[in-house]
């Protein structure tokens, strides 16, 4: 990250002209691909732990994978659908989020106190500053919209990663799902996914923006117009992303556990309420928190990586566009 980028950040104004949709899509795609490829083993382990009706332990599951003939390949099994889902899902999410936040940023009510959220405060970001309710709402809507579009890829990914079906290829997984369950099978677990993703994404954006503001205030006690250093900006975004993900993940993990069971065994579990009832009857309440440690680890790291990369790319682009606009004045 360049020092120029960090020191120009307070002067960059986020407008509908500079925040081009195509670049938000590209930045989201890049950040999503980076996090999904690096953290695929954690995602695979989470699926394996959650698929068990006896709530399998992490270490025995990992030991089984490592003892296979091709442990490295096994750990990254399902990387392609995961990268497609996370990469394009992130691209759609960040694009939709920006499209929602830009017009809301023009409203004094939704930015809070006549736009004071944007004035006289130190910032590690060039993104719009909104009220808590606006952050909660835009995060939830953007995530559910992106999740619906990417749902077929998500279902195929979960089935392919699981050893419950032992599919030999992604194409074979998709073909079998459509053949046995119809096209609606590609959307198995969407209700649980939406119930998990809407509050998760809303809470995440809310916590993330609050933590960034709080950490920026702790980091610098100088004048209000003092810009953040380059390392401070990236570290604040990374730490805020990780902490926000941990908090939101813990609150919404039961929905993730239910979603996994519905996607793996829709015939048995049927719907959300039936799945919750059966899981508690057969495995106890702890089954609703299966894979929590793995999910927190993966979500904290993936969210921190994705948002830090995304914020840096957007910040650099905003500055470049501002410089070009200034040069033509």
From Swiss-Prot:
Q: SUPFAM superfamilies given for it?
A: Mitochondrial carrier
- GO cellular component entries: mitochondrial inner membrane
* HAMAP family, A to Z: SLC25A38 (MF_03064)
Q: Does the keyword Cell inner membrane apply?
A: no
Pfam families xrefs: Mito_carr (PF00153)
Q: What does this protein do?
A: Mitochondrial glycine transporter that imports glycine into the mitochondrial matrix. Plays an important role in providing glycine for the first enzymatic step in heme biosynthesis, the condensation of glycine with succinyl-CoA to produce 5-aminolevulinate (ALA) in the mitochondrial matrix.
| Family stated for the protein in its record | Belongs to the mitochondrial carrier (TC 2.A.29) family. SLC25A38 subfamily.
Q: Where in the cell is it found?
A: Mitochondrion inner membrane
What the entry lists under PROSITE patterns is as follows:
SOLCAR
**Could you tell me what this protein is called?**
Mitochondrial glycine transporter
Upper lineage is:
Eukaryota, Fungi, Dikarya, Ascomycota, Pezizomycotina
Tell me, what is an example of a GO biological process annotation in this record? heme biosynthetic process
User: Which GO MF term does the entry hold, naming one?
Assistant: glycine transmembrane transporter activity
Q: Is Thylakoid a UniProt keyword of this protein?
A: no
Q: Which UniProt keywords apply?
A: Membrane, Mitochondrion, Mitochondrion inner membrane, Repeat, Transmembrane, Transmembrane helix, Transport
Q: Where are the Solcar repeats?
A: 19-103, 130-214, 232-316
What is the top-level taxon of the source organism? Eukaryota
Membrane topology type, per the record? Multi-pass membrane protein
Q: TM segments?
A: 25-50, 78-104, 136-161, 189-212, 236-262, 291-309
Catalytic activity entry: glycine(in) = glycine(out)
């Amino acid at each position: 990250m360049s020092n120029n980028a960090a020191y120009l950040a307070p002067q960059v104004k986020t407008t509908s002209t500079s925040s081009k949709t195509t670049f938000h899509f590209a930045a989201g795609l890049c950040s999503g691909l980076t996090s999904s490829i690096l953290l695929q083993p954690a995602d695979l382990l989470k699926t394996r732990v959650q698929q068990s009706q006896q709530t399998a332990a992490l270490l025995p599951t990992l030991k089984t994978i490592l003892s296979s003939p091709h442990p490295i390949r096994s750990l990254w099994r399902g990387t392609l659908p995961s990268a497609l889902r996370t990469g394009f899902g992130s691209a759609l999410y960040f694009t939709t989020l920006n499209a929602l936040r830009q017009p809301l940023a023009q409203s004094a009510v939704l930015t809070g106190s006549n736009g004071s959220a944007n004035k006289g405060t130190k910032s590690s970001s060039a993104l719009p500053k909104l009220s808590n309710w606006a952050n909660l709402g835009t995060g939830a809507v953007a995530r559910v919209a992106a999740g619906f579009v990417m749902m077929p890829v998500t279902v195929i990914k979960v089935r392919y990663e699981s050893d419950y079906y032992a599919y030999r290829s992604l194409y074979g997984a998709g073909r079998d799902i459509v053949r046995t369950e119809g096209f609606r099978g590609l959307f198995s677990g969407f209700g649980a996914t939406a119930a998990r993703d809407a509050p998760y994404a809303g809470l995440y954006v809310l916590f993330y923006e609050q933590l960034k503001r709080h950490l920026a205030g702790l980091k610098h006690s100088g004048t209000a117009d003092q810009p953040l250093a380059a390392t401070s900006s990236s570290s604040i975004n990374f730490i805020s992303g990780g902490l926000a993900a941990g908090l939101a993940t813990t609150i919404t993990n039961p929905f993730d556990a239910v979603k996994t069971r519905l996607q793996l065994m829709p015939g048995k579990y049927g719907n959300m309420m039936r799945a919750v009832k059966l899981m508690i009857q057969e495995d106890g309440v702890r089954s609703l928190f299966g894979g929590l440690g793995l999910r927190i680890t993966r979500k904290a790291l993936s969210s921190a990586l994705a948002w830090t990369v995304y914020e840096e790319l957007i910040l650099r682009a905003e500055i470049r566009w501002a410089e070009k606009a200034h040069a033509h004045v």
